[in-house]
Amino acid sequence: LIYGPNRVGAGRIDAPAAVSNEVLAYVQGPADSSVVSASFGVVEVSTPVATLAKTIIVENTSDRQRTYDLSYAAATTQPGVRYFLNQRSITVAANSTNTFNIRMVANRDQLRKTIDPTVSPTQVDNPRQFVADASGRILLTPRDGSLSTLRVPVHSNAKPVSALTQELTATGGNTGDITLVGRGVANGEAGGTDSYTSLVSAFSLLGTSPELPVCDPDSGEPEPTVEPDPDPDPEPEPGPCAATQIEKSYDIANVGVTSDAALYGEDDSFLYFAIGTHAPLVTHVHTQHSVFIDGNSDGEWDYQLLSTYFTDGGDPTDVPVVIGADRDGNLLPSNEEPFITYLNGAPGSLDTNLKDSSVITMVFPAAAMPMLLNLYPRFAFGVQTIGYFGSVDNLGTTTSADGFPELAEQTMSYNVRNPSLTFTVGEGDDAVPAYLAFSSDGTVIDVTTDLSSYTRDRTLGGQKGIMMVHTHNVTGQQVQTIPLPSGIDGVVIA
């Protein structure tokens, strides 16, 4: 087996040869910069065929002309992705440079989610999360046999994306149909281990949060957006900010919640939370999402649902999960038999587009939080996220002086026993929660309303509505919202 750039970069380095070599091959980067690999990164393929190109610069620092034969050696392959060089050889004059191109061509409907053959599909006996990649190395083989072969790593993660929106139509009595419109993804057998199948989930929208600014790299404060006031008032405390643009994967945009109690009864019901962010999550290891739940209406949280991951010998794995704990740190429902669910509600054998995505979902049984099924089915809750650099974003939560998370004065609220909005797919006895449902043009989600619960739900940052999660849409369009009225006049869906 050959280890690809996704795992080992260019591979081993012959240090003496690298130091004595007089010809360099590198990639032209943005704004006249240079990088050492032809990485196309994550490629969201929305058109039938996507073509991207990189320019390779060959710099000859010697006093003699050099000629190299060009070829591409694949290490890992992905169906639907191919690489092409625009020429078979290159000649570079003494003390000068020359260039050639490599093109990546991705056919949207041929893409499959295949795993690197050097990577185990499981970790700690669970299907792992992974991204498909097509990678290898450009070989520059010298015509002069006394010279060394040059290698440039090539890498991409291509995935098909859906283009789905929705229309809500009233069907009478505060019920309605959400009909999906657009193009889904159906590459391979639906839900297969190497397939891409678009998925949809629906939630009650209860939280909305504005985008955080990026911190000033010198001061750690938000960058100014206007000219400074020549006679300013005393400076206020700086607000929260994201350390970098990419760290906005912890920056909360939307929060949704739903329950399937109307289908299965409260004892067998699950709570589902969705957290949309202002930037895609690169890896679950660097961002933690928590939902804090007040189970007895005393203003303090009693339960925490949090994203984490299984470890293997102390090392993190690609098996992200959701666990629950009480205020004393005891696991739910017990330390001896904790309930553990997968982040995004499914193992890595079903593609839920977990990596490089701007939304995650968390699922947990209501019965593991007994206060919710006793006297207090309506609970207050807040969401807190922590980024790679330790930055914190709060919606309905705050951080105490000693760094402990607490609920804020203003929180969201929801009723697990009598959900305000119930979303289902299928008819009659075949109806199931509209969570990770296969989606395509014409898919219909039924919506029913419990008016009493709906009017008592409490939102933060915006109005009530429906939060649609199109898992496989392009980043930035995965979360879509449908505004709804307050319901105080008895009308929710009209």
Regions found by a protein language model. Name each.
Residues 9, 52-60, 102, 136-141:
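Buried hydrophobic-core signal for structured, non-transmembrane domains
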Residues 15-62, 87-92, 119-125, 164-190:
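Beta-sheet-dominated interaction scaffolds and their linkers
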Residues 58-64, 75, 143-145, 278-280:
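Short solvent-exposed strand-capping/beta-turn motif centered on an Asx-Ser/Thr pair
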Residues 61-80, 289-295:
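Short acidic, flexible loop segments centered on an aromatic residue
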Residues 74-89, 110-114, 333-347:
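Short beta-strand and strand-turn-strand segments in soluble, beta-rich domains
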Residues 81-125:
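Intrinsically disordered, low-complexity Pro/Gly/Ser/Thr-rich segments with frequent PxxP/GP/PP motifs
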Residues 107-163:
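Terminal connector regions
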Residues 185-220, 237-493:
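Surface-exposed extracytoplasmic segments
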